[in-house]
């Protein structure tokens, strides 16, 4: 049986959503986060040596990493609906956005989380201004400009077509969803990035997205500081 090892409030929501789009048979095994650290519980180490989510098991096969899982599931269970024909411009866009989400943009969101924790950390009075000063320089000199450049690029892309790879919904849109939902925490999308806001409205209206929330549970993105 195909099993999604589903960590609450995590990227694994996308995998449940993809499986709903595919109409595949699967089961969900839920894991709660550690209440003190916010990290995945030790039980996930029994599934994969890194103990991270998302991860799936399919018979005797174990697949981790969002992009790898999506590629595996599309290869095994799709019937040509969620991946463009190879060699086309849409396929090249598909490959790009499938990896951009967890490569370029996820690293920025992780840095935002770390900087936010530094800015809000409980520190001795003499250390707090030093830590905040360093965090401010990283945010202003690197993080915020790069986040804006990426959001501008995504907005421009969705200004040319409804979905990231053209006029057809693909698994790359599922992969990109977490990045844009994370961006929604940072900034007011409807006024600053209307195409991104429209993208979120479109995915949230999909029956498979709603079914994934019903089965996997709603999730919240916390710790990603707003500008």
Q: Which stretches of residues belong to each language-model region?
A:
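Short, hydrophobic secondary-structure boundary micro-motifs
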Residues: 80-85, 107-109, 163-167, 192, ...
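Positions that flank functional sites
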Residues: 33-34, 169, 218
């Amino acid at each position: 049986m195909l099993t999604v090892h589903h960590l609450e409030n995590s990227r694994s929501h996308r995998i449940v959503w993809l499986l709903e789009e595919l109409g595949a048979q699967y089961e969900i095994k839920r894991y709660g986060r550690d209440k003190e650290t916010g990290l995945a519980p030790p039980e996930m180490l029994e599934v994969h040596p890194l103990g991270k989510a998302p991860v799936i098991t399919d018979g005797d096969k174990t697949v981790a990493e969002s992009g790898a899982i999506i590629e595996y599931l599309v290869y095994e269970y799709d019937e040509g609906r969620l991946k463009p024909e190879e060699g086309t411009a849409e396929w090249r866009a598909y490959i790009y956005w499938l990896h951009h989400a967890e490569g370029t943009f996820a690293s920025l969101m992780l840095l935002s989380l770390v900087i936010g924790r530094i800015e809000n950390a409980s520190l001795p009075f003499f250390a707090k201004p030093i830590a905040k000063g360093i965090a401010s320089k990283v945010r202003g000199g690197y993080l915020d400009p790069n986040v804006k450049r990426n959001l501008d690029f995504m907005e421009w892309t969705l200004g040319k077509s409804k979905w990231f790879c053209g006029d057809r919904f693909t698994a790359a849109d599922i992969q990109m969803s977490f990045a844009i939902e994370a961006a929604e925490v940072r900034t007011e999308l409807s006024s600053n990035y209307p195409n991104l806001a429209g993208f979120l409205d479109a995915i949230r209206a999909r029956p498979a997205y709603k079914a994934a929330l019903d089965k996997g549970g709603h999730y919240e993105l916390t710790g990603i500081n707003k500008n």
